[in-house]
Amino acid sequence: MAICQFFLQGRCRFGDRCWNEHPGARGAGGGRQQPQQQPSGNNRRGWNTTSQRYSNVIQPSSFSKSTPWGGSRDQEKPYFSSFDSGASTNRKEGFGLSENPFASLSPDEQKDEKKLLEGIVKDMEVWESSGQWMFSVYSPVKKKPNISGFTDISPEELRLEYHNFLTSNNLQSYLNSVQRLINQWRNRVNELKSLNISTKVALLSDVKDGVNQAAPAFGFGSSQAATFMSPGFPVNNSSSDNAQNFSFKTNSGFAAASSGSPAGFGSSPAFGAAASTSSGISTSAPAFGFGKPEVTSAASFSFKSPAASSFGSPGFSGLPASLATGPVRAPVAPAFGGGSSVAGFGSPGSHSHTAFSKPSSDTFGNSSISTSLSASSSIIATDNVLFTPRDKLTVEELEQFQSKKFTLGKIPLKPPPLELLNV
């Protein structure tokens, strides 16, 4: 044992508790052999003999123990100290539950299970009375498996399937399937609100061990597996009206169109829609206008008609033909050219021209491009789409255009006349 240099200098502040040898001090054995208490006032920095920092055995740091954040006097006690906040943790046994649900539980474990079940019942009551989205999964504890019997379906998935059934004129099957899912949710909520012995055992088993959750129904190429009679909302076969009928089976990522309409990125259906007869990327109808498409073919970014539309068609977005073309079509000139039959990136008209093109049947123009980029043609090409003649404006609209600034509530919705523009 090394000799304490501070003891030799007469200023060792640890006394008999010093780890080094104090020669001539009560047997010269150092402080560890005969730990005796000293008056608490003999050290200059407030260290007393009751401190465990320099005890015979090195004490581990208090942070090395996996103590719960909530603070518990019994460190080996499973607990649900933060269950109400949704962030419960445990350190020894899963959720404070015994491995055998039928085994006798300690009072602490029984208290934790009772608190868990009461929280589930309360959550079900709030879920039912609050009007929250019912097609969702549920877990009483954060970062733990979901309780079986619930289906996770987003509003967008419901909307997509609604439009798919709308195009097939089979809304009754859609309504029947949704109603079955609603009834299934209500039955499961009622089961969890009024728990019996068998339901409690199954519920505690779900919370502790978890159940094999089904894969999401809305997946690329995924098949739906039922979990506690939950079909996962899927609508594929319109001939059947049960809840198992819903399914988002996909064969292609970005391709879908109804019969007779071209698809945007391929001919295989994207979300269970019927296969298309023509494709946006094909030899007969170039998708982006690199080539000379036929007059009857469709540009892939055209919003002219249901049969000549790719983005906004019933196949891609699930919208019916009447909804796909109504809000999008507007009397504006194409941005990158457009003729009387095919549009480039806008809504074509019979006399629509732009500053970069002349009337042409191509998407980006053909041989007329050599004469369409002049400054004179860009001025001449302007028509009534961009400007409003004076005779078509009311007196109030004309006054607003002639004034220095608009009046709130009287701003015209029409373009101004060309004569009033100062360039």
From Swiss-Prot:
Q: Where along the chain is composition biased (Polar residues)? A: 40-69
Stored SMART domains: ZnF_C3H1
Q: Where is this region: Interaction with GLE1?
A: 365-423
A single Pfam family it belongs to is: zf-CCCH_4
The C3H1-type zinc-finger regions cover 1-25
> Which keywords are on file for this protein?
Glycoprotein, Membrane, Metal-binding, mRNA transport, Nuclear pore complex, Nucleus, Phosphoprotein, Protein transport, Repeat, Translocation, Transport, Zinc, Zinc-finger
Q: Where does this one sit in the cell?
A: Nucleus, Nuclear pore complex; Nucleus membrane
GO MF, one term, reads: nuclear export signal receptor activity
**PTM annotation, UniProt:** O-glycosylated.
Identify the stretch(es) annotated as Interaction with HIV-1 Vpr.
Answer: 94-170
Segments carrying the region annotation (Disordered) are 24-85
Any one GO cellular component localisation term in the record: nuclear membrane
Tissue-wise, where is it found?
A: Ubiquitously expressed.
Q: List residues, modification Phosphoserine.
A: S106
The FG repeat units are at 14-15, 95-96, 218-219, 220-221, 265-266, 271-272, 288-289, 290-291, 311-312, 336-337, 345-346, 364-365
This protein's membrane topology, according to the annotation, is: Peripheral membrane protein
Gene Ontology BP annotations: mRNA transport; nucleocytoplasmic transport; protein export from nucleus
Q: How does it assemble?
A: Probable component of the nuclear pore complex (NPC). Interacts with nuclear export protein NXF1. Interacts with GLE1. Able to form a heterotrimer with NUP155 and GLE1 in vitro. Interacts with XPO1.
Q: What does this protein do?
A: Required for the export of mRNAs containing poly(A) tails from the nucleus into the cytoplasm. (Microbial infection) In case of infection by HIV-1, it may participate in the docking of viral Vpr at the nuclear envelope.
* Domain free text: The FG repeats are interaction sites for karyopherins (importins, exportins) and form probably an affinity gradient, guiding the transport proteins unidirectionally with their cargo through the NPC.
Instruction: State the protein's name.
Output: Nucleoporin NUP42
**Gene coding for it:** NUP42
